[in-house]
């Protein structure tokens, strides 16, 4: 079986928006025989972009999974979004992939969102190869793209191909391993002629090959010895070194082409097979057993079954689809599995291999593979399903908290019930989407990662669930925290004949910067019985959801229970829960609470002519400029700006730059809001 696993490649395609990821994926599907005709994103016909909104907007929102074959290898390919509002899709894909292809725009090289997805891939130790796309575009520069990798990503980027021609004259590439020229006919089947290197490229190719060998030989001792003794390295020697370097995540080979013009994708597929790891080349996945002991799984089909659910989607024909990556053992359809995260037993009705949103039924799946499961009702993103006799919880995924919210109201009574169902289904699919009811106003609030994120979700409610809603203006999700240390008492006593209520606690509250809520039990001598400690913690967690300044969630607080008392008859869990919330209210009077506002990382690209105007506008929005650099004939500005100042920025940037400026924005951190903002928020709160 390990022989078979050696032939698997689980890889994703990642990039900045508009670098050509989906077009590259479409060409891969065409060349591997999965598609008989090529879909283009600008026509709204791309196979991988199957949601209605994706076809309209020409961007990828969800990570579509598909499988294909290439030169005897089985490929599981995941196309991920490049838009920053949908990074959860990138995050959960990278968690289960063994390798990735980073697609760069040949003119722009590394762009802001490239840096974001690159960081995410580094976090999960995902080996990568790089495809410099759009080499036919005006201003395309392969060598500049490599420089941006070195300067902006700080990595060892090594060309294993170089382009022949550029812009409209781009005709093919020189393979530096074989030292041959590949000249493409530009037709859909990507036929090419292998020729000798053109005379005017020989010197450049020799220099670049020598550089490549210098970079890669260090990854294999035998090859290094050969190289140092002046022996000629074979193609296999070089490939072996590149593969080792890629798998170690210390080397990033760079290829070039233009997917849209059918040049270079077949060679990219060869590189996927040659250099990206198989499931047995990657480190084992870690987890904990039911006793909390660490455990490892080695992608071995003979070990007990364990898999990670990395995505939930609703299919109009079969209902709930759960995408899983199998790390150990084998799974057959019609069998039962144990969800160790939720402590529930579930039945696998059917197993399907997904080709975008089409389904091919399979009977079983083994370690190293990816598929979708029909029949799991309680399993959500990040859950581990496994063999009941050998429970395990695999490393879980941590997702960012939503930073923007808005209210939604059903237009009619009939829409009310449908809306609740739609929201619960959408929340199941997307861990960065939250929905709750505002206790004071009774409004239904939805929260997410950005305006586009919420816009798409509201659109899906209308289309997929036929729910008509009125949408409120976007609101910032502020937070609150304490800045001083204080001891606070919470006492809840109710005694009026019959059994009463008695709960009494002393809790120390202190700031816990960037560490979230932390609860510590320092009770000695049973002053508060053990069985009530959990209720004290629950009472605090509940109290934290509504802060003292403006009712926003209180974060980054450490609470230590150190004293209290109890009553033999009247004490109860509920009484201690209430006592804890009273202690929180007391602490809020003396711990000097402050309002925190979300600060966003903003990357703006503007033509030189509008640079001053754009900089002035950022400063006006309380932005702090962190850096700027020249990119071609444009300026790239990095800044930190409060989210509350960024509403309507897209429109202003368009008018300030005659429609030529671009920006991306993502959450960075929470920071204390100025007094004027706090007063404004409190005043708005008082009006409600």
Curated annotation (Swiss-Prot):
GO cellular component term of the entry, any: cytoplasm
An example Gene Ontology biological process: ribosome disassembly
Binding site for GTP: 15-22, 79-83, 133-136
PROSITE patterns: G_TR_1, G_TR_2
Annotated CDD domains: EF-G, EFG_III, EFG_mtEFG1_IV, EFG_mtEFG_C, EFG_mtEFG_II
UniProt keyword annotations, A-Z: Cytoplasm, Elongation factor, GTP-binding, Nucleotide-binding, Protein biosynthesis
Keyword Protein biosynthesis: yes
One GO MF term attached to the UniProt entry: translation elongation factor activity
Broad class of the protein's primary localization: cytoplasm
Boundaries of every tr-type G domain copy: 6-280
Annotated localization: Cytoplasm
Organism domain of life: Bacteria
Described function: Catalyzes the GTP-dependent ribosomal translocation step during translation elongation. During this step, the ribosome changes from the pre-translocational (PRE) to the post-translocational (POST) state as the newly formed A-site-bound peptidyl-tRNA and P-site-bound deacylated tRNA move to the P and E sites, respectively. Catalyzes the coordinated movement of the two tRNA molecules, the mRNA and conformational changes in the ribosome.
Family stated for the protein in its record: Belongs to the TRAFAC class translation factor GTPase superfamily. Classic translation factor GTPase family. EF-G/EF-2 subfamily.
Name of the protein this chain belongs to: Elongation factor G
Organism annotation: Ureaplasma urealyticum serovar 10 (strain ATCC 33699 / Western)
Gene expressing this chain: fusA
């Amino acid at each position: 079986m390990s022989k078979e696993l050696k032939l698997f490649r689980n890889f994703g395609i990642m990039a900045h928006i508009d670098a050509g990821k989906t077009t590259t994926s479409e060409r891969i599907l065409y060349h591997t025989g999965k598609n008989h005709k090529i879909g283009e994103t600008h026509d709204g016909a791309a196979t991988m972009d199957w949601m209605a909104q994706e076809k309209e907007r020409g961007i990828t929102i969800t990570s579509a999974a598909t499988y294909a074959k290439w030169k005897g290898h089985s490929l599981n390919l995941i196309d991920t979004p490049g838009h920053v509002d949908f990074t959860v899709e990138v995050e959960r894909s990278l968690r289960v992939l063994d390798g990735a292809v980073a697609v760069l725009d040949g003119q722009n090289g590394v762009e802001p969102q490239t840096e974001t997805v690159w960081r995410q891939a580094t976090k999960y130790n995902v080996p990568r190869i790089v495809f410099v796309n759009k080499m036919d575009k005006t201003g395309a520069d392969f060598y500049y793209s490599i420089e941006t990798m070195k300067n902006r990503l700080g990595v060892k980027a090594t060309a294993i191909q170089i382009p022949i021609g550029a812009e409209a004259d781009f005709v093919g590439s020189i393979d530096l391993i074989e030292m041959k020229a590949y000249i493409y006919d530009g037709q859909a089947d990507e036929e090419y002629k292998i020729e000798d290197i053109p005379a005017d490229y020989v010197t450049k190719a020799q220099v670049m090959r020598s550089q490549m060998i210098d970079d890669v030989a260090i990854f294999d001792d035998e090859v290094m010895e050969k190289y140092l003794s002046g022996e000629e390295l074979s193609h296999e020697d070089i490939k072996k070194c590149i593969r080792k370097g890629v798998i170690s995540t210390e080397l990033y080979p760079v290829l070039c082409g233009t997917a849209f013009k059918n040049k270079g994708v077949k060679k990219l597929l060869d590189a996927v097979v040659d250099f990206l790891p198989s499931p047995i080349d990657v480190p084992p996945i870690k987890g904990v057993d039911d006793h909390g002991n660490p455990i490892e799984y080695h992608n071995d089909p003979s070990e007990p079954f364990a898999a990670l659910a990395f995505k939930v989607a609703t299919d109009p024909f079969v209902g709930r689809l759960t995408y899983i990556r199998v790390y150990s053992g084998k799974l057959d359809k019609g069998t039962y599995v144990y969800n160790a995260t939720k402590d529930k037993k579930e039945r696998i009705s059917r197993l399907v291999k997904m080709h975008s949103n089409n389904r091919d039924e399979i009977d079983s799946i083994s370690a190293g593979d990816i598929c979708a499961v029909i029949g799991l009702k309680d399993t959500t993103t990040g859950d581990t399903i496994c063999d009941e006799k050998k429970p395990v919880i695999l490393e879980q995924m941590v997702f960012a908290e939503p930073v923007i919210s808005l209210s939604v109201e059903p237009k009619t009574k009939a829409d009310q019930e449908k809306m609740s169902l739609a929201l619960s289904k959408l929340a199941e699919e997307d861990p960065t989407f939250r929905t709750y009811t505002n206790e004071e106003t009774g409004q239904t609030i939805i929260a997410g990662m950005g305006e586009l994120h919420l816009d798409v979700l509201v659109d899906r409610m209308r289309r997929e669930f036929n729910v008509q809603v009125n949408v409120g203006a976007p609101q910032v999700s502020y937070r609150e925290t304490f800045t001083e240390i204080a001891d606070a008492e919470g006492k809840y006593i109710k005694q009026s004949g019959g059994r009463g209520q008695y709960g009494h606690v002393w809790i120390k509250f202190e700031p816990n910067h960037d560490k979230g809520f932390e609860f510590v039990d320092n009770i000695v001598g049973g002053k508060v019985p053990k069985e009530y400690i959990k209720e004290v913690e629950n009472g605090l967690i509940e109290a934290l959801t509504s802060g003292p300044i403006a009712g926003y969630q209180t974060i980054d607080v450490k609470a230590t229970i150190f004293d209290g008392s109890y009553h033999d008859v009247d004490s109860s869990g509920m009484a201690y829960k209430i006592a804890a919330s009273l202690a929180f209210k007391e602490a809020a009077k003396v711990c000097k609470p402050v309002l925190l506002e979300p600060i966003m990382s903003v990357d703006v690209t503007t033509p030189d002519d509008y640079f001053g105007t754009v900089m002035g506008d950022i400063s006006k929005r309380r932005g702090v400029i962190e850096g700027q650099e020249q990119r071609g004939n444009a300026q790239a500005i990095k800044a930190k700006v409060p989210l509350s100042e960024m509403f309507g920025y897209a429109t202003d940037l368009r008018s300030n730059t005659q429609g030529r400026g671009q920006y991306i924005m993502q959450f960075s951190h929470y920071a204390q809001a100025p007094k004027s903002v706090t007063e404004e928020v409190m005043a708005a709160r008082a009006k409600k």
